[in-house]
Amino acid sequence: IRTILITCVPLFLVATGFLMNRKELSAQYVLGIVPVIISYIGISLLVWGVLSLVGKGSDFSTAINGIFDYSTDSYSWYVEMYLGLYLFIPLLNIIWNYKKEIKNYHLYIVFIASLLTFLPSLLNSFGKVIPDYWQICYPVSYYFIGAYLYTYQNEIKKISIGKLVTGFLSALTIFTLTDTFASWNQEFQWLDHNDYFGYQTAIMTVLGIAIL
């Protein structure tokens, strides 16, 4: 179950790339972030209020300060990540659409993004082989994957659903077994390969959204 559920954030990032890869910089676009900020503040205060009712909330001044450092709600890291990605999207789209007529240009972008963020969790399993400095940039990689799925959706639709489902179930089985053995007789081991930037999560995300 965890192997599937951890794809929720990556799926949202891929969907963002799928839907927003044509957005351009404008005042209207920048102002589009305001509803996100308002929702974040409202939800953070709501969470603080509920925790306060059960005696687990901080004082009000700490809650207000926590809004600015994303600590009032424990899941605020996601909003912190998305705000930055949202502001970057017009620039990412310039990269995506700059030389799209060049053969394999988009494939190169996705490959480099995957090489820097996802592959280190696989290739560095038994020792550092490739740089892993850029793993934290996984939101950008998922965004470009979404843009790729949008741009080449007609070609992707030609892949039979049977092959995709088989691949998904096979990957799910293998990853579940490897994670189970890695955590045998101890608490679940949250490691690079099963993190948001891990190759397991990336593979499950791509196969899952391709099926959808």
Indicate where each model-derived feature is located.
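Transmembrane alpha-helical segments and their boundary/interface "anchor" motifs
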Residues: 2-11, 20-52, 56-76, 80-85, ...
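Alpha-helical transmembrane segments and terminal signal-anchor/GPI-anchor hydrophobic tails
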Residues: 137, 154-212
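Transmembrane helix-loop junctions in multipass membrane proteins, especially transporters and channels
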Residues: 25, 52-60, 94-102, 122-129, ...
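Structural signature of transmembrane alpha-helix termini at the membrane-water interface
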Residues: 18, 45-53, 57, 87, ...
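Aromatic-anchored segments of alpha-helical transmembrane domains
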Residues: 43-49, 64, 110-124, 167-183
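Specific transmembrane alpha-helix
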Residues: 8-23, 78-93, 122-157, 200-212
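Solvent-exposed interhelical
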Residues: 86-114, 148-170
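Non-cytosolic membrane-interface motifs at loop->transmembrane helix junctions
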Residues: 2-3, 64-69, 127-136, 189-200
